[in-house]
Every structure is written in structure tokens, then in C-alpha cells.
């Protein structure tokens, strides 16, 4: 509880929660508690890291439809994208591909197939910077979320500069990992900066260093 209260205090406007690791009812209670703490004003992203089957994914989609959930990220394993797409059609909550679109070729494949949900893009591992920017140009603004791949702060700065250049800034960015790199001797308080419409320009980003 204290951790989430701290994040709210830092100005975070979106939270990511890992699901699919514990008892379903227990995880639902955790989500409900966070919704209560934020008075339902903070959209929640749920990340299952591809651990679920169809039945469990459907169960979570039913639950998420009653909560302020922005999307459920990669509930099923890579290779199960069409099954995920079929499930998503029955619910208002969006599904996001993460592991399924780690690399540029995968992103192109599902972009060409017109995936109807969200793409979680990790610039540090996706591939060619310019080719990635070209591919992102084809996607609707609200279909892209940029995310950390646990790179150092130097790597994160390069990823963030690509996010700014792409212009896809509708959704909050998933770079809330700075606490993992405090021993690097450099850190950025990225929380409020990485919210919807929070990335103004490269000049704004440089001011953080």
C-alpha cells in the first residue's frame, strides 16, 4: 500500500500491476484496493507476461471490464495472438502485445494484420531506429505504448528520444524502472514526465539531466 501511495504522490497517472502469478481472487482484491486508493482515477495496466490460458484470460477480461483498466498486457504466450484477438472482441478492455512485438519484424507482422489493441514497443531491442520510426508512423497514436527493456539510464534516454521523435505520446510511457538503477550513479525522476501528453520536446528531456 505504501508503495502505491508513494507513486500517487509522485504524480504517476497510470500504474502497472503484474497478474497471473498468484490466486485469482487474491490478485483481484489487490486491484480493488488500488482502485479504492486512487478513487478510480488512475488507469491500471495489468501484465501477465504470457502466463495465461484462454479460460484465465477470459476471466481477467470479465473482471477488468468492471474496473478502470487501460489494457491487459500479453495475457497469453507469443503465438497465441489470434486467440487473444478473438477474446478481446467480446470485451471493452483492450489487450496489448508485448513479447509478441519485441522485434521490428514482429511489429510489422501484427501491424500489417491490423491488430486491434495496443502495441508495447521497446525501442532498445526492437531494431533499426529509423526503420522503427517508419513503422510507427503507420500506427494510430493511441495504439502505441513505449516501454523500458531494463536498459541503463543511458539506454533509456535513447529510447525516450525515439518516443519523442515518433510523436506517439497519447498513452503514458512504461519507463517507471529508475529505482532499479540507483547504483548506476545516475537517475531520473521520470514519473510525472512520462504521462499522457507529457513528452513535450527533446529540450524538455534534456532539462531532466
Language-model features, listed with the residues they occupy:
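A beta-strand-loop signature enriched in Asp, Gly, Thr, and Trp
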Residues: 75-77, 82-145
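Active-site beta-loop-alpha junctions enriched in small/polar residues
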Residues: 18-22, 47-53, 75-79, 98-102, ...
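Short, low-complexity, polar/charged sequence segments that are solvent-exposed and flexible
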Residues: 7-10, 34-36, 64-66, 114-116, ...
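Metal-dependent enolase-superfamily TIM-barrel catalytic cores that perform enediolate-based chemistry
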Residues: 1-91
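Short amphipathic alpha-helical patches
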Residues: 27-31, 57, 84-88, 95, ...
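Catalytic cores of alpha/beta
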Residues: 54-64, 103-115, 129-138, 152-168
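Flexible C-terminal active-site loop/helix
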Residues: 149-209
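Hydrophobic faces of well-ordered beta-strands that scaffold small-molecule active sites
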Residues: 13-17, 42-48, 72-73, 93-98, ...
Amino acid at each position: 500500500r505504501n508503495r502505491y501511495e508513494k507513486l500517487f504522490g509522485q504524480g504517476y497517472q497510470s500504474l502497472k500491476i503484474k497478474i497471473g502469478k498468484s490466486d485469482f481472487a487474491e490478485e483481484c482484491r489487490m486491484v480493488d484496493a488500488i482502485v479504492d486508493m486512487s478513487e478510480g482515477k488512475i488507469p491500471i495496466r495489468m501484465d501477465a507476461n504470457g502466463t495465461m490460458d484462454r479460460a484465465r484470460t477470459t476471466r481477467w477480461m470479465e473482471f477488468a471490464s468492471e474496473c478502470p483498466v487501460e489494457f491487459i498486457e500479453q495475457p497469453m504466450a507469443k503465438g497465441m495472438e489470434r486467440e487473444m484477438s478473438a477474446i478481446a472482441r467480446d470485451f471493452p478492455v483492450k489487450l496489448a502485445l508485448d513479447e509478441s512485438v519485441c522485434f521490428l519484424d514482429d511489429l510489422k507482422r501484427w501491424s500489417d494484420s491490423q491488430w486491434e489493441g495496443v502495441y508495447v514497443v521497446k525501442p532498445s531491442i526492437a531494431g533499426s531506429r529509423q526503420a522503427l520510426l517508419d513503422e510507427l508512423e503507420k500506427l494510430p497514436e493511441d495504439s502505441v505504448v513505449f516501454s523500458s527493456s531494463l536498459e541503463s539510464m543511458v539506454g533509456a534516454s535513447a529510447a525516450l528520444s525515439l518516443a519523442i521523435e515518433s510523436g506517439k505520446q497519447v498513452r503514458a510511457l512504461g519507463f517507471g524502472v529508475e529505482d532499479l538503477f540507483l547504483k548506476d550513479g545516475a537517475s531520473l525522476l521520470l514519473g510525472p514526465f512520462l504521462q499522457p501528453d507529457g513528452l513535450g520536446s527533446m529540450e524538455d528531456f534534456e532539462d531532466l539531466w
